[in-house]
UniProtKB/Swiss-Prot annotation:
Gene3D superfamilies: Anticodon-binding domain, Bira Bifunctional Protein, Domain 2. This is Histidine--tRNA ligase. SUPFAM superfamilies: Class II aaRS ABD-related (SSF52954), Class II aaRS and biotin synthetases (SSF55681). GO terms for biological process: histidyl-tRNA aminoacylation.
Length: 426
């Protein structure tokens, strides 16, 4: 029987993994520049965390979670998103008592959702996320959005758009909820079954419906921006002011509510506008979650964050025709001619690697010509040929693959020679 990977997952082979490593490293470096530190949480958590943290009326909880019972009878769930686990760790380890506030964290890792696989959407996918917990300053909202935009710009993306909205505070959302119920009640039967159920449980989520997004009831729905109280409106104005000061263009979409229940005040998405990118145009989403820490058992603590999909980021780079500056070649391929030379190259290759060089050798007993072809396929900058004659002189015949120039180099000086030459070519 030939086994295949489960539906909605993917294997990342050499040549692809380097792209992932590159974009993740760019994101990590920028996070450190902005003062964020890495946190790592388990891949599975107690199911109750997501019921309370994400919201038991959300599609994620109702339809998409991978939940199982362990041998001790505990209900556990593969994490479908990263914010609730990070906030759980923040509360469990009492990071709210840290003298360094706000606590600024980033994470990267696989998430799991039982969704219909399609372009840009997987059942196992990798999120890179940021959380800033402990500040209700609108400036940190702007910083978080600036960091997200900085990551995309640093990778060369040009056709992206920042979309923002405000969901306001508790009072603003309550007034908006009542207006939505009045608006949809008489004609709710025209919408999908999910929307009909949401009218009772969470009317705001009707605006996030993908099936009925073009229905005229959606277009005429009351805008949250008309129900913001003075405090919420002033907060949103300050966020917009900071974004303008940072020269970060944005558009406002009053229907942007996000698919998680913990959001309030600022919500945002970064969209790809690349031609032909398709339906998965949302690259990144985030917002403020001032009640989540308290919901998970901690003190009342504000927070804001975002998560981006690495898969969609790479798809956006491809859509814009951006080639990442990845060098897959090696510094040197050591060619052994004869058994005596083979014994010497085993030791020599190890020494060159210890010196910091990327080095390969033959393990298939190939002739010199075949070894040289292998070196070329691996993108070797140099080959070092060692045969009986070179062993007698304790040298290697070093050939520069690009120019064909060949030089005899003492074995004891080979590492320093290669280091100096490879640095010169960088």
């Amino acid at each position: 029987m030939a086994f295949q990977i489960p539906r909605g997952t993917q294997d990342l082979l050499p040549g692809e993994t380097e792209k992932w490593q590159y974009v993740e490293q760019v994101a990590r470096d920028l996070c450190r520049r902005y003062g964020y530190e890495e946190i790592r949480t388990p891949i599975f958590e107690h199911t109750e965390l997501f019921l309370r943290g994400v919201g038991d009326t959300t599609d994620i909880v109702q339809k998409e979670m991978y939940t199982f019972e362990d041998k001790g009878g505990r209900a556990l769930t593969l994490r479908p998103e990263g914010t609730a686990p990070v906030v759980r760790a923040f509360v469990e380890h009492k990071l709210y008592g840290s003298p360094n506030q706000p606590v600024k964290l980033y994470y990267a890792g696989p998430m799991f959702r039982y969704e219909r696989p399609e372009a840009g959407r997987f059942r196992q996918f990798v999120q890179f996320g940021v959380e800033a917990i402990g500040s209700s300053d609108p400036a940190i909202d702007a910083e978080v959005m600036a960091l997200a935009m900085h990551i995309y710009k640093a990778l060369g993306l040009k056709h992206i758009r920042l979309v923002i909205n405000s969901l306001g505070d508790v009072d603003s959302r309550r007034a908006h909820r009542e207006a939505l119920v009045r608006h949809f009640s008489d004609r709710i039967h025209e919408l999908c079954p999910d929307c009909q159920a949401r009218l009772e449980t969470n009317p705001l989520r009707i605006l996030d419906c993908k099936k009925d997004r073009d229905h005229e009831l959606m277009a005429s729905a009351p805008s949250i921006l008309d129900y913001l109280n003075d405090e919420s409106s002033a907060y949103f104005e300050k966020v917009k002011q900071y974004l303008t000061m940072l020269d970060i263009p944005f558009v406002i979409d009053s229907r942007l509510v996000r698919g998680l229940d913990y959001y309030n005040h600022t919500t945002f998405e970064i969209m790809s506008e690349a031609e032909g990118f398709g339906a998965a145009a949302t690259l990144c989403g985030g917002g403020r979650y001032n009640g989540l820490v308290q919901e998970i058992g901690g003190p009342e603590t504000p927070g804001i964050g975002f998560a981006l999909s690495i898969e969609r980021l790479l798809a956006a780079l491809e859509a814009e025709g951006i080639e990442l500056p990845i060098h897959r070649g090696i510094d040197c391929y050591v060619v052994a001619v004869g058994e005596r030379a083979k014994d010497e190259t085993v030791r020599l290759v190890y020494e060159l690697r210890r010196a910091g060089l990327r080095v390969e050798q033959d393990y298939l007993g190939r002739k010199m010509k075949a070894q040289l072809k292998a070196a070329d396929r691996l993108g070797a900058s140099f080959v070092a040929i060692i045969g009986d004659e070179e062993l007698e002189k304790q040298t290697a015949a070093v050939k520069h693959m690009a120019s064909g120039e060949q030089t005899d180099v003492p074995l004891g000086e080979l590492a320093s020679f290669l280091i100096e030459r490879t640095k010169r070519e960088e």
